[in-house]
């Protein structure tokens, strides 16, 4: 399965996980995919929510997947101390990740607790009984990119790492991880963080024609800021 140029934009007040393949992955196997030039944006005011580059929340296996995704989380209720998750592979849960190449451009504006990771926002095994015996695998993965975020909260967590934002259960084999990742925290809480920050963007279009082996696509480039 290859996904090119998907655009997912969700606005809700309910708990929600958004991702290109599965918002909820329940003991799911996802393998040998390419997810390219894909944009996932979730605007929410719920207590728990997030975005992922492959899957949202859950369990299972991710193998041999290449991604190039833009992820956006916008928290719209400053009074709620929410738990927000963003991950280049998945937002939260305990999926195994093996031989995956993740490119992430993340933007997270949150007034609660941030859990952001180049691979996983938060690694957590559930239910509790399973967490006592479960042995997972996070092997031979690479991450490239940046997550720009703010956490507008005096009781701060601000979890953001190249691999996993927060780890609740250290119950997995881990090796072969490489990264070229930037943790970019900002402190102007009045400005919602988005990939396109121009108030009046001006776009030029470049068409790449389809071939027998590849899909065609159009690249839109802002002449003001260079965003594509």
Features from the language model and the residues they span:
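Predominantly extracellular/luminal carbohydrate-interaction, adhesion, and secreted-enzyme modules
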Residues: 1-197
């Amino acid at each position: 399965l290859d996904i090119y140029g998907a655009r997912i934009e969700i606005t809700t007040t309910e708990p929600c996980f958004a991702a290109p393949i599965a918002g909820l992955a329940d003991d799911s196997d996802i393998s040998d995919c390419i997810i390219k030039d894909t944009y996932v944006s979730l605007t929410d005011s719920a207590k728990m929510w997030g975005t992922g580059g492959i899957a949202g929340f859950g369990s299972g296996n991710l193998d041999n997947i290449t991604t190039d995704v833009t992820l956006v989380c916008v928290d719209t209720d400053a009074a709620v101390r929410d738990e927000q998750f963003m991950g280049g592979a998945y937002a939260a849960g305990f999926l195994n990740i093996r031989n995956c190449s993740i490119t992430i451009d993340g933007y997270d504006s949150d007034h609660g607790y941030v859990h952001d990771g180049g691979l996983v926002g938060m690694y957590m095994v559930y239910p509790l009984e399973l967490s006592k015996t479960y042995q997972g695998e996070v092997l031979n993965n690479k991450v490239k990119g940046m997550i720009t975020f703010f956490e507008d909260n005096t009781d701060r967590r601000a979890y953001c790492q190249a691999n996993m934002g927060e780890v609740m259960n250290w119950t997995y084999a881990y090796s072969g991880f490489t990264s070229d990742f930037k943790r970019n925290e900002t402190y102007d809480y009045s400005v919602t963080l988005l990939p396109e920050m121009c108030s009046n963007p001006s776009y030029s279009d470049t068409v790449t024609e389809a071939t027998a082996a590849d899909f065609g696509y159009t690249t839109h480039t802002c002449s003001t800021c260079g965003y594509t």
